Amino acid sequence: MDALINLKDCKEYMTITINGNEHQIKLAGIIEDPYFCGKDVCTILGYKDKEQALRKRVKSKHKKSLSELFEKKLPVVTTGNFFLGTQNELSYHEGKSIYINEPGLYNLIMSSEAPFAEQFQDMVYEKILPSIRKYGSYSIEQKLSSAMEQLALKDKSEEELQIKLQEERIEKENAYMKLRSEAKRHKEQIKRTLEFNQATKQIEPLEYIYICTTEYYQQHHKFKVGGVQSFKDLKSRLTQYNSGESNSEAHFFIYVRKTVSYRSIEHIIKGLLSGFRENQSNELYIMHCDWLVKFLDAIMDGNAEFALLVNSNREQIALDTINKEPTILPPIKLEQIAYIRAGDEPRDLSSVLGQEMIDSIKEAIESFEPMDNTVKRKEFELHLLSKSPNVSLTGKRRDTWELTRQLGSSINPMWRYKY
C-alpha cells in the first residue's frame, strides 16, 4: 500500500496505491483541518452504495458540501499557498459533493469490510495526516512501498484463504443450524398434531357390538351383527332394524360385548363374512350361531389385544415419533414382492444355486429370444432345460427365476419378466 501527497505540485488531491491499483482522493479545506472527498473514499473502501454510506456512517458534524467549504474557505487565511482543493469556480454538481473530515474518514474506515481497511486507517492516522499538517508533503520511500506491496499481496492471499475457510465454516454452521431448525420445527409440528389428536389419551371400550335376532330368524340361522356408541342406544336400536320381514313379535339380543370401535368390528365382519350375508342389500348373516359367536369373539379378542398394546405403549409411541430418528427402509421391487419384505437383505443366489447352474442360466439367457421382450418363467425354464438337460429345478424354481431376472437385466435392460 503506497500513498503519495505532494502539496507543492498539487494541492487538489492525493494519490494512493493499494494492491497495485492507483486511486486519487480529492482534497478540500486547509492543512490544519483537511477534508476528503467522500465518494473517493467510499470507492477505495468498497462501499457499493456510496450515498447511503455517507448518509448513515458519517455524522452531520463531520461532513460538508464542497460549496459550503468553498464559500467559507474555513476561516484561516494565514495558510495562503496551503489552502487545499480547487480554486476554480464550482459547477452545480461539484458543489453538491460531500467532503468528510478526519473523524468522518475514520467512521467510513471502521465500517468498511475491505481487508486492508485497518492498514489504511493506521496509515491515515500515523503518517498521512501528520505529514499534511507538519510538512505539506508526504511520500513513502520506494523500498517501503515495495515491502508494503509484497506484504499486502501476502496478507491478501492469507486473508483470502481465511475468508474462504470462514465462509465454508459459516456455510456449514448455517446448514447445520438450518437442519436443527427444521428438525425442531418438524418435532413441534408432530407434537402439536399428536396433542391435538389426543394420541397419548388411553382408549376406553365404551362402545358395544352385538348379535341380534328373532325367534323365527334364530330357527333359520339368521342373525344381525351391529354396534352402537353407548349403552342407552342398545334398546332404541331394537326397533330400528330393517332386516326383512319376521314372523316373530320382536328382536332381541343374544350377544353384547364392549369394544373400542364398533364400526371397525362391523367393517372386519363385512369383509371376512360377506359370503354369508343373506344378500348385499341387508345386514342379515346366515350362519350357525356357534360359529358366528366364535368368529366375533376372535375378532373382539384381537381388537382388545390391539387396544391393550396401543394403550400400554402410547406415551412411548408419541416420544419415539417426536424424538427418534426415522427408520429408512429400502423400497420393495414389485417383481420381488413374493420373496422379500422391507428391511430384508437380498440373498446371495450364487451360493444357493452353485456355479454349474449359474453357467447354465447365462448360456440359456444368451440364446433366449422372448416375444415382445417379455420373459415368461415357464417358457424360460423349458428353454433352460433344453439347453442343459442335466440341471434340476426341483426346489430351486424361485431362486432360479430370481437369478434369471438379475442376469437378464444386465444383458438386456429392455426385457420384462412375467412370473
UniProtKB/Swiss-Prot annotation:
Segments forming a coiled coil: 150-195
Domain Bro-N: 4-136
Keyword set, alphabetical order: Coiled coil
Cross-referenced InterPro entries: BRO_N_domain, Phage_T5_Orf172_DNA-bd
Segments crossing the lipid bilayer: none
Family: Belongs to the IIV-6 201R/289L family.
PANTHER family hit by this protein: BRO FAMILY PROTEIN, DNA-BINDING PROTEIN-RELATED-RELATED
Protein name: Putative Bro-N domain-containing protein 201R
